[in-house]
Amino acid sequence: MTTIRSRKAKGRRLQDWVRDSLRGLFLTLTDDDVKVAIMGERGTDVKLSKQAKKLFPYDIECKNAEGWTKIYNAYDQADGHGDDHPVVFIKMNRRKPLAIIDAKHFMKLNNVGFITDPIKVEYLDERKR
């Protein structure tokens, strides 16, 4: 059983990874352009300035949970099909389809025109520490 503190820490690690990855992706942005929301704050989990929104026009919600097993199993299946980048399309009744891709690949797709390495941050899972 996990504690509220450990669940919040796990969520915070993912938010920090996204923030740091975006800062590494767009070197023209300052620390003030990409910030992590305070726990419990309304709105997106990673706050982007107007300048950052011009470069990365997304509203970011971070969810770090163990309940994604079926999605990861589908992703592993797609990954085993060949050498290309895997993508999983998911859909529920009365909901629009979603595409699931690797986060680093997503960052690289948004790095078009930049010469920096988009991902300079490794995501550290507490179990690997």
Predicted regions and their residues:
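Catalytic phosphate/metal-binding cores of nucleic-acid and nucleotide-processing enzymes, i.e., regions
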Residues: M1-R129
